[in-house]
C-alpha cells in the first residue's frame, strides 16, 4: 500500500472538488485547476476529505496511487493558499525588475533579458530577490526554473540566479605559483 496514497486529502472551507469521469476539478479563492484521473484508482469524497483507493493491486496502480494523490493535494493547496518560489540574483550589476506582465533581467549580457509571465503567475522584486507566486505548483516551478536557466550560478564566485536556500558548490580558483 502506498503510504502517501492512503492518506485522505482534507478539503478546506471555500474549496470545491468535483469528481469527473476523466478529470478532478478543484475550485477555490485563488483559481481553478484540473488534474487527470487514473482508471486504476477510485476517488471518493468522505467527511470533507478526498479518499483515493486502488481498483487493483499492481505495481503500476501503486505508483499511480501516490502520484495522483500528491497532484490532487497540490491542486487543493494551490487554490486555497497558493505557492511561491524565491530566487536570488547575485553579481555586480545584476538587476531584476518587474514591469507589468514581464520580468526584466540585467545579468551581464549585452542586452536585458525579458521573460513574459504566463497567466496565473505573479512576480515581485525586492532588491536582489525575485518572488514567483501562483496557484499552480508545476507552473510556478517551471517559471522559476526558466528564469534560473538564463544565468545559473557559477561555482567560482557564485554569480548568477539561484533559488533562495540553494547551496552552490564552490570551487577553488587557480592556485599556481609565480615563476
Swiss-Prot record:
Keywords: Ribonucleoprotein, Ribosomal protein, RNA-binding, rRNA-binding. One of its GO terms (molecular function) is structural constituent of ribosome. Pfam families: Ribosomal_L6. GO terms for biological process: cytoplasmic translation. The keyword Ribonucleoprotein applies. Coiled coil: none annotated. Residues 170-179 have a biased composition (Basic residues). Residues 154-179 are annotated as: Disordered. One of its GO terms (cellular component) is cytosolic large ribosomal subunit. InterPro entries: Ribosomal_uL6-like, Ribosomal_uL6-like_a/b-dom_sf, Ribosomal_uL6_a/b-dom, Ribosomal_uL6_bac-type, Ribosomal_uL6_CS. It comes from the Bacteria. Residues 154-169 have a biased composition (Basic and acidic residues). Part of the 50S ribosomal subunit. This protein binds to the 23S rRNA, and is important in its secondary structure. It is located near the subunit interface in the base of the L7/L12 stalk, and near the tRNA binding site of the peptidyltransferase center. Belongs to the universal ribosomal protein uL6 family. This is Large ribosomal subunit protein uL6.
Amino acid at each position: 500500500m502506498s503510504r502517501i496514497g492512503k492518506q485522505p486529502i482534507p478539503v478546506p472551507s471555500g474549496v470545491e472538488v468535483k469528481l469527473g469521469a476523466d478529470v478532478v476539478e478543484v475550485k477555490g479563492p485563488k483559481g481553478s485547476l484540473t488534474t487527470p484521473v487514473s482508471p486504476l484508482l477510485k476517488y471518493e469524497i468522505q467527511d470533507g476529505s478526498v479518499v483515493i483507493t486502488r481498483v487493483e493491486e499492481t505495481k503500476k496502480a501503486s505508483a499511480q496511487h501516490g502520484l495522483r494523490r500528491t497532484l490532487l493535494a497540490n491542486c487543493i493547496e494551490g487554490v486555497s493558499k497558493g505557492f511561491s518560489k524565491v530566487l536570488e540574483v547575485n553579481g555586480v550589476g545584476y538587476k531584476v525588475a518587474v514591469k507589468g506582465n514581464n520580468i526584466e533581467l540585467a545579468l551581464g549580457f549585452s542586452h536585458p533579458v525579458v521573460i513574459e509571465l504566463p497567466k496565473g503567475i505573479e512576480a515581485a522584486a525586492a532588491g536582489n530577490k525575485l518572488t514567483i507566486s501562483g496557484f499552480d505548483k508545476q507552473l510556478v516551478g517551471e517559471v522559476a526554473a526558466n528564469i534560473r536557466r538564463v544565468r545559473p550560478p557559477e561555482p567560482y564566485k557564485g554569480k548568477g540566479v539561484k533559488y533562495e536556500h540553494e547551496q552552490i558548490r564552490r570551487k577553488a580558483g587557480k592556485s599556481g605559483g609565480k615563476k
